[in-house]
Swiss-Prot record:
Domain of life: Eukaryota
Pfam families: BURP
Organism: Vicia faba
Residues covered by region (2 X approximate repeats): 166-222
Cited InterPro entries: BURP, BURP_dom
Name recorded for this polypeptide: Embryonic abundant protein USP87
Residues that carry a glycan: 259
């Protein structure tokens, strides 16, 4: 199955906050990409910042991170119900089995149960390169260093709140081997930026059961040998390394890819 690459007109880029730079992170963003406002998704990913008993990924958002499916399911009129694995947290970190006391649910774990050090300094999975960063500036620097250019763009999901039934309207390919940056579910602002080889990112246009139109950033893994075998079998009844497996990316994350267009709004 072939998917059209995103065109300038159809490209789904992050929503922007149309405000003048008034904070250090906004000033830094403007220094890299002048006249391009800080995207709203990044503002949302930075909230809350150190607030007591306040985590960035709310309970109603968990199903955004707990849906596995096959690549051939990405076609118009396909129905999806979010959440097809009992291990809700595992889909956030689906690449490795539990080891050395570090569980797959680390991204959704309470900080008293797991520490950031457990996650950030744990061994990488097969074909994975990862870095933990503690600010938007560090994320930008890391991604620019990775691609060797500021001509890049970021793409995110905008799942509708309290909706878990969707129908696919359209599928657009974003690119291969994107760098994903996820907000970890701790009060302290920390992002996990990682790239897994042999992956393809898509933007999937969805219509919720109440008629709301949304976009879902989606990643398909063509090499699943580094994924959690129990998770794969639980959700899809397949074994490692047999077929491509995909999952949605929730609202508190972004994919960075090279920008080959001339559309300034997407040069971020």
């Amino acid at each position: 199955m072939e998917f059209a690459h995103l065109t300038v007109l159809s490209l789904f880029c992050l929503a922007f906050v149309g405000i003048t730079a008034t904070s250090p992170r906004e000033d830094y963003w403007q220094s890299i990409w002048p006249n391009t406002p800080l995207p709203k998704t990044f503002s949302d990913m930075l909230i809350p910042s150190g607030k007591t008993n306040s985590l960035p990924i709310k309970s109603e958002e968990l199903k955004q991170y707990s849906t596995l499916f096959f690549e051939h399911d990405l076609h118009p009129r396909k129905n999806f119900i979010l959440g097809n694995t009992n291990s809700v947290g595992s889909i956030i970190r689906p690449f490795t089995k539990s080891r050395q006391g570090v569980t797959d649910s680390i991204w959704l774990a309470n900080k008293e149960k797991q520490s950031l050090e457990d996650f950030c300094y744990s061994p990488t999975a097969i074909a994975e390169h990862k870095h933990c960063v503690s600010s938007l500036k560090s994320m930008i620097d890391q991604v620019i260093s990775h691609f060797g250019s500021t001509k890049i763009k970021a793409i995110s999901s905008n799942f509708a709140p309290y909706q878990d039934q969707y129908v696919v309207e359209d599928v657009k390919k974003v690119g291969d081997n994107a760098v994903m940056c996820h907000r970890l579910n701790f009060e302290k602002v920390v992002f996990n930026c990682h790239q897994v080889r042999d992956t393809t990112a898509y933007v999937v246009s969805l219509v919720a059961s109440d008629g709301t139109k949304t976009k879902a950033l989606t990643v398909c893994h063509h090499d699943t040998r580094g994924m959690n075998p129990e998770l794969l079998y639980e959700a899809l009844e397949v074994t490692l390394g047999t077929v491509p497996v995909c999952h949605f990316i929730g609202n508190k994350a972004a994919a960075w890819v090279p920008n080959h267009t001339a559309d300034n709004l997407c040069v971020m």
